[in-house]
């Protein structure tokens, strides 16, 4: 009985390791090194009308600051951007690793900010027309809204981590 328990325990150990190494949907090389206090765009997510901005602070306790900025007041979001501390994105909970953005520090070549952008699909198939476009017709949308059959929105979230040794 003890042997079977230990075998099951050993077989389950690698599972979290594989989950942590999820392959992102979008792969890009690392961004160009950024100077301390230089505000830069990390990623734009037009579906959520959101731009992720960041900057290295020079503070050892919080070396990188990441902010979410609304792209435009007129932008109508087709996706939600959720706080990663509230939703804890992971593949186990239905999220997909969309992209991993690496931003090296110009003043400390051993340190980089790593931003994981996660996407949670709405879970529905989108019907495309003959031109390959998703069309939303006002009268159909009003009818669906009146019937309480609004489509779920996809969601995005971003997780910030620091990699490498601090230079101070």
Regions inferred by a protein language model and the residue ranges of each:
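Sec-dependent signal peptide recognition
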Residues: 2-10
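Hydrophobic h-region of N-terminal signal peptides that target proteins for export
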Residues: 10-19
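Ser/Thr-rich low-complexity repeats and stalk/linker segments
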Residues: 21-168
């Amino acid at each position: 009985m003890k042997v079977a328990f230990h075998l099951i325990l050993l077989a389950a150990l690698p599972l979290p390791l594989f989950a942590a190494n999820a392959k992102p949907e979008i792969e890009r090389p690392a961004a160009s090194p950024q100077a301390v206090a230089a505000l830069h765009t990390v990623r734009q997510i037009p579906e959520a009308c959101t731009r992720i901005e960041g900057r290295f602070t020079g503070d050892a306790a919080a070396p990188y600051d990441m902010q979410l900025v609304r792209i435009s007041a007129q932008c109508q979001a087709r996706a939600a951007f959720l706080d990663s501390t509230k939703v804890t994105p992971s593949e186990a909970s239905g999220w997909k690793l969309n992209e991993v953005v690496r931003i090296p520090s110009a003043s400390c070549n051993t340190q980089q900010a790593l931003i994981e952008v996660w996407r949670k699909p709405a879970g529905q198939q989108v019907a495309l027309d003959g031109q390959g476009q998703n069309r939303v017709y006002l009268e159909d949308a009003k009818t669906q809204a009146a019937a309480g059959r609004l489509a779920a929105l996809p969601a995005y979230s971003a997780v910030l981590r620091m990699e490498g040794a601090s230079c101070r």
